[in-house]
């Protein structure tokens, strides 16, 4: 009678343990009870439960670490993107001001120097910026406008210099014709009239 009760108690205990394992550790092999003899492949019931619980805790800790690491990376990317977007928007606003000053002809020397540097590096920067399409298009339009206006201004300056040089050259020619040897009209400068020796010419100049 006591043996039957003991066997029943063992089955009940085994069922309880298997129920706990099923809830806590899904997929873990169940403990089998056989004719009053409990066989466990890796040791006693307590050892098996302890080992599996530790394994479960390790897996949970590893998952928590991965989740924290992933969240940290996501947060870092968001902060970086927010900072980049802010810098790009500030630069866009600055370019718009420069564009306005360019059209109005009120660029300062500092702004003009900045534009010269901007034109050289703007193409590479535009490729690397991660902006919305419309912002990228706006920046490209500003770049092209600035480049066009700057080149036009440079061409105008060169044209003015060429016209001034031509005018100056013509004036120099006229002045040169006017200051010919006025003592002997019609003669090429540097030539003395027939009969006038070099000594006479030299004495007169003295």
From Swiss-Prot:
Cell compartment(s), UniProt: Nucleus, Nucleolus
Function: Involved in ribosome biogenesis, probably through modulation of rDNA transcription.
Pfam families named in the record: RRT14
Gene name of this polypeptide: RRT14
Protein name: Regulator of rDNA transcription protein 14
Keyword Transcription regulation set for record: yes
Acidic residues biased stretches: 197-206
Superkingdom as given in the UniProt entry: Eukaryota
């Amino acid at each position: 009678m006591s043996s039957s009760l003991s066997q029943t108690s063992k089955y009940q205990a085994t069922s309880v343990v298997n129920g706990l394992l099923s809830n806590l550790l899904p997929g873990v092999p169940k403990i089998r009870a056989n004719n009053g003899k409990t066989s466990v492949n890796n040791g006693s019931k307590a050892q098996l439960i302890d080992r599996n619980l530790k394994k479960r805790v390790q897996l949970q800790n590893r998952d928590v670490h991965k989740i924290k690491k992933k969240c940290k990376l996501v947060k870092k990317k968001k902060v970086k993107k927010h900072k980049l977007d802010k810098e790009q928007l500030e630069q866009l606003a600055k370019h718009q001001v420069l564009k306005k000053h360019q059209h109005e002809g009120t660029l300062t020397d500092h702004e003009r120097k900045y534009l010269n540097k901007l034109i050289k590096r703007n193409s590479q920067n535009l490729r690397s910026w991660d902006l919305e399409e419309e912002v990228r298009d706006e920046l490209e339009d500003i770049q092209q406008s600035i480049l066009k206006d700057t080149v036009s201004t440079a061409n105008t300056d060169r044209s003015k210099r060429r016209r001034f040089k031509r005018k100056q050259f013509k004036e120099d020619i006229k002045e040169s014709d006017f200051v010919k040897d006025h003592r002997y009209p019609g003669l090429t400068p540097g030539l003395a009239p027939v009969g006038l020796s070099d000594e006479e010419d030299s004495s007169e100049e003295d």
